[in-house]
């Protein structure tokens, strides 16, 4: 792809990476553009390697690039893991996450689309990395409620201690989803917000 761009009239590449390049969870500090890269699965490693190719191929050329690392991308028509949650909600199956007080960043597909458009439109935004997310983070329980509300459904949730959920998930062979469901993954998107304000596009991050 980069070689094709170098041989074309394309002026800028906006590469959609993933927050998985930084890791699967955060502790005290949210991920930012200066955070260490620590991918924990093949998908994250692949995105990290692709970012490296983009930088190495285009950095010293006359082509510009933007790398964006989004977290979970949200829309009313949910896909992937969120679609699985929606199907559970539709079946009125109670979910045991009411007492999980984690915080996870998401980005609305509209917010992400508007920020991509900003990067394409403004020629002075070049060779940058952005972490793009909504200003508000959600607990797993709040995200489930949001999915239900946006689809005109009611969700049933009850409390199960976190340690018990961890044990159950490991026993049933779902240990890989522990971080996704129970731990924090927060993003500091202040750099992206700053650039949006700089170019008078404040409404991009007004949607929570």
Task: Enumerate the predicted regions with their spans.
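Conserved Rossmann-fold NAD(P)-dependent oxidoreductase catalytic core, especially the SDR/UDP-sugar
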Residues: 2-42, 58, 66
